[in-house]
């Protein structure tokens, strides 16, 4: 593991730059390119805390009214399946319908983009729940949030969640 201290790598007058990392393996060089930006007092922590709060409240029906305020339900969403849920879904689907899943792993949070307008975050985790046949089933879940913080007010700009069942060959 290598840690790069980039605090002084980019002049304050430069807002965005390309970082090139070269890894030399025997006789070959491997290149990795990424974008780095200056962080001028952005609200990534507030956006992450907001997304975590929404994530947790989807598992508790008592927060239905609060969560409903962030949804934009319309015909763009397929409210017949819990496999894909988005900001256009109804509150029942956002809150897992009658599935009653239990988070069975740590939730892995990552910031995908952070700029002056919004922050995009991704949560990855697994849930277990009882399936139609009465057996415990496990699902991989990805939850995407696009959040804006403006003058202390939080806005959910986009949301999507997908879940895919993990195949169990023993059943």
Regions picked out by a protein language model, each given a short descriptive name:
Residues 75-76, 85-88, 116-123, 136-141, ...:
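A broad "ordered helical/assembly scaffold" signature
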Residues 47, 51, 66-69, 124-140, ...:
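N-terminal secretory signal sequences
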Residues 1-19, 89-135:
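Surface-exposed, charged secondary-structure patches
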Residues 1, 16-98, 171:
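Core segments of small alpha/beta cavity-forming domains
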Residues 3, 22-24, 34, 58, ...:
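Residue-identity detector for threonine
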Residues 8-44, 135-171:
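Short beta-strand edge/turn micro-motifs at domain boundaries
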Residues 66-73, 118-129, 157-164:
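Generic hydrophobic segment detector
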